[in-house]
A protein has these predicted regions:
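A short beta-strand-turn-helix
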Residues: 14-30, 55
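Short, flexible turn/loop "capping" segments at secondary-structure junctions
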Residues: 24-27, 75-76, 160
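Short clusters of hydrophobic/aromatic residues that line enzyme substrate/ligand-binding pockets
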Residues: 23, 108, 168
Length: 178
């Protein structure tokens, strides 16, 4: 792990952030890129940690979400696609959806696309547009690129993070991010 950390400092990982929505100050000096799966219980735990970081360091930290739905979680892909569809409309709505998916993760697991659509409505999205975009080539290509990027970084599970170029895999306490 120490060797990998040193390698990341020498040659930082550079996730593609072009056109991605973020939570927190877009010009913050620290960028946390989270590779997430909306059905992953460890990803759900990480939401509280991310909130602590954003609240503890206002203006200093921003969060960018990358989609890495695992095959073992069949409802993670529709949720991932919807997050990105909503991001095309409004970043704030996409992040409200992110919060809702983790707050009501059991409903996502049980209800799948039906809950994804309900959540899009609840965050105030243009649902017909979101449903079109959810199935569209642009959103599908974006999620496929996120998956490939995470695999290219050697990530084998979720959550995984890249913090200013340095990788962290798994759920971590706040202290590991600062």
């Amino acid at each position: 792990a120490a060797d990998r950390l040193e390698a990341d400092f020498r040659n930082p990982r550079r996730p593609d952030l072009v056109g991605r929505v973020s939570l927190g100050d877009p010009s913050a000096p620290v960028t946390i890129v989270e590779y997430t799966d909306f059905e992953c219980p460890y990803c759900r735990q990480s939401v509280a940690v991310i909130h602590q970081l954003l609240n503890r360091y206002p203006g200093k930290v921003r969060l960018v979400i990358k989609q890495t739905p695992l095959e073992m979680h069949p409802n993670a892909m529709p949720a991932a696609l919807m997050f990105e569809a909503l991001a095309l409309q409004d970043g704030a709505k996409a992040f409200a959806f992110y919060e809702l998916m983790y707050a009501e993760q059991e409903r996502l697991k049980k209800e799948g696309q039906r809950f994804v659509e309900e959540a899009a409505r609840r965050v105030g999205a243009d649902v017909p547009r979101a449903l079109r975009d959810q199935q569209g080539d642009q959103v599908r290509a974006l999620v496929a690129a996120d998956i490939a990027e995470g695999q290219g970084f050697g990530f084998t599970g979720t959550p995984a993070f890249v913090v200013n170029g340095v990788a962290l895999e798994g759920a971590h306490p706040v202290e590991n991010f600062v």
